[in-house]
Amino acid sequence: MSSRSRSTFLAIACFVLIDWVTKLAVLLYLGNLPDANPILYQYSWGKLLFCICPTFNEGAAFGLFAKYKYFLFFIRITIILGILAFLFLRKKTSSPAIRFSLILLCSGAIGNVGDIVFYRHVVDFISIGYKRWFFPTFNFADIFISLGTLIFIYKLYFPTKQKIK
């Protein structure tokens, strides 16, 4: 295995581990509470609010397409395999930013697919709000997917210019 492949594998493993360990910690803590919808942690800073409150999501982003679980699972696995094939089989080196964005996307997808395999749903637990408005609850895998998508789109629209010698 080349050093590039090894570092790619280690990066994906680290990001997936971060996602799974945080979800497991929330689930273990949740197991000790009798409340059906607990807030495990809450911090407010003025009108901004941060909460750790577990929710379970059977669909895609924000619970979309929950009725199509098997189709979504197939799509997720296909995307993961496609990204892994690109990262490990492509001989030509892509830009470091594109490579990093794909590592983040793959890590987030693996994290959420792991939830579906082990728990039959995705474990979301991070909630951010302002006044009475709350963003849908999410997890670290969602952060990795969102950040990877933003970096990928940015590099597509604003590629690094080659220096002319």
Curated annotation (Swiss-Prot):
Its EC number is 3.4.23.36. GO terms for biological process: proteolysis. Pathway: Protein modification; lipoprotein biosynthesis (signal peptide cleavage). Belongs to the peptidase A8 family. The gene is lspA. This is Lipoprotein signal peptidase. GO terms for molecular function: aspartic-type endopeptidase activity. The keyword Protease applies. It comes from Chlamydia abortus (strain DSM 27085 / S26/3) (Chlamydophila abortus). It is a multi-pass membrane protein. Pfam families: Peptidase_A8 (PF01252). GO terms for cellular component: plasma membrane. This protein specifically catalyzes the removal of signal peptides from prolipoproteins. The chain crosses the membrane at residues 9-29, 69-89, 98-118, 133-153. The active site is at D124, D142.
